[in-house]
Amino acid sequence: YYVKRADFVACHNQSYVRQYDMVQEVKPGGTFLLNTGWTAEGLDTNLPGAMKRYIARNGIRLFTIDAVEIAHRVGLGSHINTVLQAAFFKISGLMPVEQALDYMKDAARKSYARKGDAVVASNVAAIEEGAQKCVEVAVPASWANAELDACASDEGLPAVVTNILRPVNAQKGDELPVSAFAGYEDGVIDMGLTAYEKRGIAVKTPTWKADACIQCNRCAFVCPHAAIRPYLVSEEEAAAAPAGFETAVLKGGKNLPEGMRFTIQVSQFDCTSCG
């Protein structure tokens, strides 16, 4: 079973604050760490009203760290786990922080010694930065009475999305009554529900370079979430497209459709930044 009353909760992706109840299981007086690039003003603008209320009314200590920026700067790419682990030991007080960091550095040296000094140095730097760059945010008193956000409209949505998909995706599936599954006793579920699951969790997305593309479509083939897709557009569609919409002359040999141009489009709401 998952922990339901925690002293420490960390959110490693800032988009999750609007998808899940990230602080509801933090004990009063507990600690919440958010990995984000938002400033204090950005937190006030972007955090849901219910989250701000819970933090203020329950005396939750709020910390932030931009682990994505740190990992990229020290050479770890998208690997933020080491940065956030160091931040955890700095904030939690579970053990003397210097001792914890020394253990982490020793483990990094043993784990990555075969990969070279540069990799070891990057991990050691990530550990040090993770402990140094986590910042406690002064929670404004006004958050205790923060305005609650309007609920998303269910108008026009299929019943399966409203009654099953949304609660399950919000990790509230255990709260669904048996009656919610009436009509689905045989396990068959509606198709095409991906259209209603736009998570928007990517911290960075790929950019198509039209002048370097050989139009092999391999990028679209290997993308596990089908976020990268090739299209053919007519000259008229290309001319009417928004600014920044890139296309290229169609390649590929004989029998090509006339008057069509090639483009690769990336869905930022489906991408997971796996690259």
Regions found by a protein language model. Name each.
Residues Y1-A170, A238-A243:
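Active-site cofactor/cluster-binding pocket
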Residues L101, A113-C274:
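Ferredoxin-type iron-sulfur electron-transfer modules and their immediate structural context
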